[in-house]
């Protein structure tokens, strides 16, 4: 961390998952950066579940790591149970996940922030954006201190006019025990942003010493654990098991008898919650025919007896929560440390953003995380990284970076947000990516690290490691393609191939479902020189090779459309557009022809007119030179 200043290139508001990535990325790019947060001690706090990664989300963590972000390394330092979800399925849809020790995770994040050059942590409450001539010029804190800057990244999470609901009770808070951010919402509204409201929730916290662990199914992690970061060689933190139990019909009876007291059903909460992380009362109402719902009992730390019961998020009154817990196997005598609650907060329509995460309405203002309508630590971290990089580039007068849908899940997420907007908190899934065969968690560094090196956001250690790894992988591919065998020769090793007389390489053989690296190494001992980690990549590459080559044609077509940049076109001057198309384009302000095509109701004819207009304008500009 740097000494305290009053003038910065970039100011990041909020020390959560988006804010930490934004601040560190900005500072890594050489920008003098301030991270404004209420208290240094809350930096990196895991407000809800003590876990990182999962399906779709694990891809985002790997992509953050590939661009030298923090989350992967910090999760590796704090992880106490690692599992790859969907391991029985193909690599494209596998999701690395880690259960984390809250204290270890926060300590590792705080250490990383403390050690970052060009970065100052400013303790205080962000209150008012300072604007001049349509450009962000600074920030005023609640105590009156002004901070000058060239760009601001807002990453306020659930703090924007946060309001906690617990049964009939409500009180203003950003999360339990912490004050909300009120002035920033007013400042955004004064600029012209229309704010919406979203809702999320969290389950009660339990005393693990009062759980009957013998009555629940125990779930161990993977052995050996698979880290998130390519820079993590081994996981040295002790590993734990989690428990699995279920709600019962008795649980459901308690909830049904009291559902009218839930803020979601009493009318007290009118905002929308996350579809894929419903409250337990939502589950009972929406899936009334189910006789039980799974609950994961997740320890919150190695030296902490607190347990997070993943699956029973609720805002029912405290006494109702106390009544429903003993109806769950293993929790008959459990002590509740803290009740669950729901929280409502402000958000901005993400269609107000460019793909750089800069707002269209105000130059120099970037938004990342839950303020954009997303839910989840990983979604926030990935947005924070992109916003931080672009804030630094903007403040320094550079060209912004855009990650598209073929680059990674981070590009898919941002494109979904800025093109389609949200009607509920957005969560990442592998199903959202049309190029998921190439956007795998295992190849995030192969897709993005070279881009990061060219951009200047990847440090020397990672760059050297990456080049060494890529050289080794290319050598392994060459070796695997250089050794060949005929069907008759393969039969001697127990392999059944089409007897067409064609010689097949080791690389081609690994494309067969029943043939892996161990089988081809048994035929060609020289393949034994390939290290285990590289061998895993080599086998996955071989399995997907034909499909990836086929999908690359789709990616090329996509990139051609993405290469046609619309910029600040006045759509009133484009002849031939229908009034409907003109209105939609003017409202959405798409970045490229490709993005315009993803606007609901946009026709191929309208896209053809736009492409023809761009070509005419390009010829006209060239003729004038």
UniProtKB/Swiss-Prot annotation:
Its cofactor is FAD. It comes from the Bacteria. Gene3D superfamilies: FAD/NAD(P)-binding domain (3.50.50.60), GidA associated domain, C-terminal subdomain (1.10.150.570). GO terms for molecular function: flavin adenine dinucleotide binding. One of its GO terms (biological process) is tRNA methylation. It is found in: Cytoplasm. PROSITE patterns: GIDA_1, GIDA_2. Keywords: Cytoplasm, FAD, Flavoprotein, NAD, tRNA processing. NAD(+) binds at residues 273-287. FAD binds at residues 14-19. One of its GO terms (cellular component) is cytosol. The keyword Cytoplasm applies. InterPro entries: FAD/NAD-bd_sf, GIDA_C_N, MnmG, MnmG-rel, MnmG-rel_CS, MnmG_C, MnmG_C_subdom, MnmG_C_subdom_sf. Its main location: cytoplasm. Transmembrane segments: none annotated. SMART domains: GIDA_assoc_3 (SM01228). HAMAP family: MnmG_GidA. NAD-binding protein involved in the addition of a carboxymethylaminomethyl (cmnm) group at the wobble position (U34) of certain tRNAs, forming tRNA-cmnm(5)s(2)U34. Homodimer. Heterotetramer of two MnmE and two MnmG subunits. Belongs to the MnmG family. This is tRNA uridine 5-carboxymethylaminomethyl modification enzyme MnmG. The gene is mnmG.
């Amino acid at each position: 961390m740097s000494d305290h200043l009053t003038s910065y290139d970039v100011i990041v508001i909020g020390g959560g998952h988006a804010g930490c990535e934004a601040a560190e990325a900005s500072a890594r790019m050489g920008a003098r950066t301030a991270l404004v947060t209420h208290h240094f001690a809350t930096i990196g706090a895991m407000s809800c579940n003590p876990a990182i990664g999962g399906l779709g989300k694990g891809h985002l963590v790997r992509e953050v790591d590939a661009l030298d972000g923090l989350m992967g390394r910090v999760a590796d330092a704090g992880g106490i149970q690692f599992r790859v979800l969907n391991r029985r399925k193909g690599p494209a849809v596998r999701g690395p996940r880690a259960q984390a020790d809250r204290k270890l995770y926060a300590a590792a994040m705080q250490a990383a922030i403390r050690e970052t050059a060009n970065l100052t942590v400013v303790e205080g409450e962000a209150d008012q954006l300072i604007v001049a001539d349509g450009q962000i010029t600074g920030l005023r804190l609640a105590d009156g201190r002004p901070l000058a800057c060239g760009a601001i990244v807002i990453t306020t999470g659930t703090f924007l006019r946060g309001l906690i609901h617990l049964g009939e009770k409500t009180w203003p808070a950003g999360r339990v025990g912490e004050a909300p951010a009120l002035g920033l919402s007013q400042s955004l509204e004064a600029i012209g942003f229309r704010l919406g409201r979203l809702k999320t929730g969290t389950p009660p916290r339990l005393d693990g010493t009062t759980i009957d662990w013998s009555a629940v199914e125990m779930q161990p992690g993977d052995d050996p654990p698979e880290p998130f970061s390519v820079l993590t060689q081994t996981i040295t933190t002790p590993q734990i098991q989690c428990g699995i139990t279920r709600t019962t019909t008795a649980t459901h009876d308690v909830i049904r008898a009291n559902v009218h007291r839930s803020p979601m059903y009493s009318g007290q909460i009118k905002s929308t919650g996350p579809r894929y992380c419903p409250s337990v009362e939502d589950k009972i109402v929406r899936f009334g025919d189910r006789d039980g719902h799974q609950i994961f009992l997740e320890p919150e730390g190695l030296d902490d007896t607190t347990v997070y019961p993943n699956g029973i998020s609720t805002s029912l009154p405290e006494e109702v929560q106390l009544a429903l817990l003993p109806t769950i196997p293993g929790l008959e005598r459990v002590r509740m440390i803290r009740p669950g609650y729901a929280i409502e907060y402000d958000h901005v329509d993400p269609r107000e953003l460019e793909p750089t995460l800069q707002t269209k309405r105000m130059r120099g203002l970037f938004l990342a995380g839950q303020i954009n309508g997303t839910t989840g630590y990983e979604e926030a971290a990935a947005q924070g990284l992109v916003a931080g990089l672009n804030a630094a580039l903007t403040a320094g007068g550079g060209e912004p970076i855009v990650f598209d849908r073929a680059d990674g899940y981070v590009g898919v997420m941002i494109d979904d947000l800025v093109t389609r907007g949200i009607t509920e908190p957005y969560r990442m899934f592998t199903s959202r990516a049309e190029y998921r065969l190439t956007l795998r968690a295992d190849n995030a560094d192969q897709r993005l690290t070279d881009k990061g090196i060219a951009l200047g956001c990847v440090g020397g250690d990672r760059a050297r490691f990456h080049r060494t790894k890529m050289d080794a992988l290319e050598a392994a591919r060459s070796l695997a393609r250089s050794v060949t065998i005929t069907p008759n020769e393969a039969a001697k090793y127990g392999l059944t191939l089409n007897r067409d007389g064609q010689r097949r390489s080791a690389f081609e053989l690994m494309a067969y479902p029943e043939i892996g690296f161990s089988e081809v190494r048994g035929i060609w001992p020289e393949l034994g020189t390939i290290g285990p980690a590289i061998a895993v990549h080599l086998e996955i590459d071989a399995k997907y090779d034909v499909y990836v080559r086929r999908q690359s044609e789709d990616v090329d077509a996509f990139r051609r459309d993405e290469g046609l940049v619309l910029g600040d076109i006045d759509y009133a001057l484009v002849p031939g557009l229908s009034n409907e198309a003109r209105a939609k384009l003017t409202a959405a302000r798409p970045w490229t022809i490709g993005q315009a095509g993803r606007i609901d109701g946009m026709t191929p004819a309208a896209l053809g007119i736009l492409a023809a207009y761009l070509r005419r304008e390009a010829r006209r500009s060239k003729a004038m030179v």
